[in-house]
Regions:
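ABC ATPase NBD coupling module
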Residues: 62-77, 101, 106, 220-224
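Conserved ABC ATPase "signature" C-loop
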Residues: 208-209
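Conserved ABC ATPase "signature" region
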Residues: 64, 107-125, 176-177
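A short, proline-enriched helix->beta-strand linker immediately N-terminal to the Walker B motif
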Residues: 148-152
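Conserved ABC ATPase signature
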Residues: 129-133, 137
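ABC ATPase "signature
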Residues: 214-215
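Helix-to-loop junction immediately C-terminal to a conserved catalytic motif
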Residues: 45
Length: 242
């Protein structure tokens, strides 16, 4: 079966949590502090090993009771709160690093890196060093680097935390377009309802390690059933992107 599928526990309370994200869909995970959002991302990308759980992507089992595929072999792209770029490499070298690690020839890796930079409207930054980038520019480069590895799934954690507020809408547009082109399943953790409306197709509300509400963006925003969903969306929200 195509897509990302997870079922397991996030904490010692042994609440079962299940996610099913088809290819090309973006699932926003929201919830109060301590709900387990970061733990969920760490489990999916391989930074944590679950006490009990199963993860498969495109039919390949990555985690179950008998196996645990390490993070570097999962081909899952991760875009975190703070873009982590190698300071000794220029932007093109940073984006080409992943493909080179996957044994792609140097010339092909650079061509792919430039293609990914163009996709996020950052080709003009290719020769710059990370220290010369603004928060928004660094976020674009980090997104290009994640996409250059041809990920089977994308995980995004508060991607605009280090971005100036006035630049955030433009970056949301770039992220949305890039994810649509790649077409892989994506899980985004955010506290900002504007991120949900602009980027996501579906929402999962996480509380105390379990999903208490799940559904299409428009439905959950209009008729939230959980206490946190009601609190988060009980205000005028921007329209969801078509």
């Amino acid at each position: 079966m195509k897509g990302l599928h997870w079922e397991g526990t996030l904490n010692s309370r042994n609440h079962e949590t299940g996610l099913d994200v088809p290819p090309g869909r973006v699932l926003a995970v929201v919830g109060p502090n301590g709900a387990g959002k970061s733990t969920l991302l760490d489990l999916l990308c391989g930074l944590l090993k679950p006490d009990r759980g199963r993860l498969d992507i495109d039919g390949q089992v990555l985690v179950d009771s008998r196996r645990f595929v390490p993070a570097h072999r999962r081909r899952i792209g991760l875009l975190g709160q703070q873009p982590l770029l190698f300071p000794h490499l220029d932007v093109l070298g940073n984006v080409a690093y992943g493909p080179r690690a996957q044994k792609l020839r140097r010339d092909k890796a650079k061509a792919l890196a430039l293609e990914m930079l163009e996709r996020v409207d950052a080709a003009g930054l290719a020769s710059r060093r990370p220290g010369e980038l603004s928060g928004g520019q660094a976020a674009r480069v980090a997104l290009a680097r994640a996409l250059a590895t041809k990920p089977r799934a994308m995980l995004i954690d508060e991607p605009f935390a280090a971005v100036d507020v006035e630049y955030t809408p433009r970056l949301r547009v770039a992220v949305k377009a890039a994810l649509a082109e790649v077409g892989c399943p994506c899980v985004i953790v955010t506290h900002d309802p504007a991120d949900v409306a602009a980027l996501a197709d579906d929402i999962a509300v996480l509380e105390s390690g379990r999903i208490v509400e799940h559904g299409p963006v428009a439905e959950v925003i209009a008729y939230p059933e959980s206490s946190f969903g009601t609190l988060l969306f009980d205000r005028d929200q921007p329209e969801q992107s078509p």
